[in-house]
Amino acid sequence: AKPMVELNTADSLTLLKVRGIGPYTAHTLIKWREKFGGFYAVNQLRDLPGIRAENADIIASQVTVDTSLVKKISINTASYEELVRHPYVSGELAGQIVRFRGYFRPFESVRELGQLDLRNPLDFDKLVPYLITHSTEDSTRSTR
């Protein structure tokens, strides 16, 4: 059996060895990996534009992700621009985060985002792996 390829560190040549990944898909994966700050789950492949679901499943069976490599964003210190750059953070959410901590207090937990008055419901499971409340917080600690 071929060794699993780790998605957060693989370069395009390594990605091309995975069945289901051609040059376009390798480029797409690296582009989105940079936008996200890393992948926390192989099923995120299904979210990526330009990768068909059946292809995502073929790829997913041959790759792993090292979640310790995911870049975290501190909701208490990140600027609006830093927040909104993340694909899962809408302009509305970024604005509310900055407003909340400006008017009230720093966030004590990422779960407090659920109390913000947002037009669109948050997809917590997608968002939580990328967010922390303190830049020094141990990123391995679960927020569930």
Question: What are the residue ranges of the model-derived segments?
Answer:
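Membrane-embedded segments
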Residues: 1-20, 24, 30, 49
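Extracytoplasmic
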Residues: 1-2, 10, 24, 40, ...
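Small-residue hinge/turn detector
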Residues: 22-23, 52, 90, 120
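Residue-level signature of tetratricopeptide-repeat
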Residues: 33, 100-101
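Compact, charge-rich alpha-helical regulatory domains located at protein termini
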Residues: 42, 109-115, 121
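Alpha-helical interaction/regulatory segments in DNA maintenance proteins
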Residues: 49-71, 117-144
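Short, solvent-exposed interaction modules
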Residues: 71-97
